[in-house]
């Protein structure tokens, strides 16, 4: 890693759209990293955002924020990729595959050529497929290529459960796993409120109906569509999730977060990036937590993985993209 050992933490953000600009804002507000470079093809807008963000520093903490070039990634600790074609109303994340794979190659190649030796964090959609593509295009070790995965989905899940039972969302422990998209699934078997399983909570609180739990998951799964139809894009939630992941990396936290990670036998899956709880620190992914799933949950995991694998295989064949591994 380039700078973490020196107590100077540097992030390069590629993509200054709605998600990227809010992510940079979240880093600024939370005092994460000492240096943030922003790369985008719309350079004037990026320069404006860098100046605007810098104006907030007197209220937050010292930081260097600037419009960057790909070459600035050379000594960065983390490169965060949010650039890509946006998801339109009525469009699934998987509809974006071919467009965003082409864009991704134009990003990863110059980043690698800069001499970058840190961690890739991918948020562009479809995130599981683009994380896999970043790994293939970069030639980086699988531990140092990470996708935002189901981090936002799990946060939504916890928040909605918390609202239903009237507790703090931070006291709810629950995961969404699989694809960040239509085939994701809730891990009800391990969901708990302060250590009490959801199933036990429902028994003890008759006012909580099991049908409400089903509606909660459907709301979580479809949240992006709802938000996009209402305001055109999602960015506050995912920008904050990316800031949380970045902090876990830079501060060497060994945090357990639901991320898009490379499967090497876990859950019976191989050669795919998919959402699962994993331990993350400044080295990247150090351990994938293989949660004991029910038969139904395991079936859902494999269904999700099959869809992702089928699409990524087809996309790479059709686009004939040259990779480094």
UniProtKB/Swiss-Prot annotation:
NCBIfam families: L-LDH-NAD (TIGR01771), PRK00066.1 (NF000824), PRK06223.1 (NF004863)
Gene Ontology cellular component list: cytoplasm
Residues bound to beta-D-fructose 1,6-bisphosphate: 158, 173
Function as written in the Swiss-Prot or TrEMBL entry: Catalyzes the conversion of lactate to pyruvate.
Keyword Disulfide bond found: no
Stored HAMAP family: Lactate_dehydrog
Pathway it works in: Fermentation; pyruvate fermentation to lactate; (S)-lactate from pyruvate: step 1/1
Stated name of the protein: L-lactate dehydrogenase
Organism, as annotated: Latilactobacillus sakei (Lactobacillus sakei)
Residues reported to bind substrate: 87, 93, 125-128, 153-156, 234
């Amino acid at each position: 890693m380039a700078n973490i050992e020196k107590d100077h933490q540097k992030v390069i953000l590629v993509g200054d759209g709605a998600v990227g600009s809010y992510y940079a804002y979240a880093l600024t507000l939370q005092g994460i990293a000492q240096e943030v470079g922003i790369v985008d093809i719309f350079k004037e807008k990026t320069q404006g955002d860098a100046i605007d963000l810098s104006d907030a520093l007197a209220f937050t903490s010292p930081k260097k924020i600037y419009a960057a070039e790909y070459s600035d990634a050379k000594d960065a600790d983390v490169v965060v990729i949010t650039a890509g074609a946006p998801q339109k109303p009525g469009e699934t994340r998987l509809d974006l595959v071919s467009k965003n794979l082409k864009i991704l190659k134009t990003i990863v190649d110059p980043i690698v050529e800069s001499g970058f030796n840190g961690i890739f964090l991918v948020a562009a959609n479809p995130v599981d497929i683009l994380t896999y593509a970043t790994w293939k295009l970069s030639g980086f070790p699988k531990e140092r290529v990470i996708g935002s995965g189901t981090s936002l989905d799990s946060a939504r899940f916890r928040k909605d459960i918390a609202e239903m039972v009237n507790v703090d969302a931070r006291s709810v422990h629950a995961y969404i796993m699989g694809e960040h998209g239509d085939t994701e699934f809730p891990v009800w078997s391990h969901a708990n409120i302060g250590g009490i399983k959801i199933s036990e909570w429902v028994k003890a609180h008759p006012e909580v109906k099991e049908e409400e739990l089903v509606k909660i998951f459907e709301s979580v799964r479809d949240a992006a569509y709802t938000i996009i139809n209402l305001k055109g894009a999602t960015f506050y939630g995912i920008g904050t999730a990316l800031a949380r992941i970045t902090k876990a990396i830079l501060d060497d936290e060994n945090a357990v977060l639901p991320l898009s990670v490379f499967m090497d036998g876990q859950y019976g899956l191989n050669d795919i990036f998919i959402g699962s709880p994993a331990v993350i620190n400044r080295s990247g992914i150090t351990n994938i937590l293989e949660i004991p799933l029910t038969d139904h949950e395991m079936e859902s995991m494999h269904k999700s993985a099959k869809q992702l694998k089928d699409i990524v295989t087809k996309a790479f064949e059709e686009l004939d993209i040259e990779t480094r591994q």
